[in-house]
Amino acid sequence: MSFETVRYTPEWRASLVSLLARVGTTQLSDEEFAWWFERNPAGEGIVSLAVDGGEVVGVAAMSFFRTRLNGVETRLAIPVNVATDARYRGQGVFSRLERENEEAAATSGSPLTVTFPNAKSHPIFVRRLGWIDLSRLRLWARPLRVSGVARYLLGRPGERGGLRAPSRDARTLHGLEVRPLERFGPELDELGRRAAEGYANHFSRDAQYFNWRYLDSPRDYRCFGAFRGGGLAGVAVVGHTFKHGVSAGFLADLVAAPGDGRAVRALVARAVAEVKGGADALVLLPPPARAERRALVRAGFAPTNTKLRFIGKALHDDAQVDRRADAWHFTLGDFDFF
């Protein structure tokens, strides 16, 4: 079967959303597509399509993220949504679309790119497209139900579950006031700058990004701030997912100044309250600082056996992808499928 490649334009949206609903690992609604690709404050994404007879049969997309890379803010293009109609698999659809996207990303000024591939796309990225494997990201978890742990070990699916009904109450936890946030402001910009000291390379965390990524999202996220003496000491974002038969709450983001373990514990306590009773576990990718990891251990978290694939590729001759295990920091909110 033959196909041609085109850059996305709005007349293709309905067919593209239909393809993602059928075969995509991330099933975007029309509203989610507009939010993710058209309203991203870092710029509209790069979306390449394979089309045949007026139908979208393949897609590969990249989104832009403002990134602190070696201490300097730059804009990286990151592969996100990938899907190929089953009738066209084995014909090089993804490889062709991804190459076109990487050329466009390089032209846009992105010096390199990284992503979190699934088991199907990983060998294509590495063997055909020249990406390199980087240190995998280990997931941490706090079990919330003993029965959930047993089901997971036995490979048995549980109930879907979900977040509790939202509460607007402020609570005093570990000496800090933790309350829901309806909007992020300049105080998060300052907190993000302080937290960045312990993050190495990472997506920039500020009010503009958080407002778009979480509060403007069609998805259900709960955002909380921890306050000490009236000042913002930390932020947590909580969501829920059901993957591989496991009902899990997840910390999409957790931001605190390096060494502020008390703020971490206060935010985690509120996150647990949001998902307890509706999830088997609360999971996250931990911050790199030892004090924050100690706080997570005290709050009942432990490393799991699950590691997420992480790969990268230089797009310019003078760029290098840092292979060190401690060179990058990501949260689950940095993934398009959480």
Where are these regions (language model features)?
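Active-site/acyl-donor-binding loops of N-acyltransferases
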Residues: 111-164, 213, 237-338
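Conserved acetyl-CoA binding element of GNAT-fold acetyltransferases
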Residues: 73-86, 246-258
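A short helix-loop-beta-strand connector motif used in the catalytic cores of GNAT acetyltransferases and
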Residues: 38-49, 53, 58, 126, ...
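Conserved beta-strand in the GNAT
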Residues: 47-49, 55-65, 78, 83, ...
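Short amphipathic alpha-helix that is part of the acyltransferase structural core
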Residues: 1-57, 72-78, 155-208, 249, ...
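Oxyanion-binding "anion nests"
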Residues: 195-227
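Short, high-confidence coil segments that cap the C-terminus of an alpha-helix
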Residues: 45, 107-110, 219, 277-281
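Conserved acetyl-CoA-binding loop-helix of GNAT-fold acetyltransferases
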Residues: 84, 89-103, 260-273
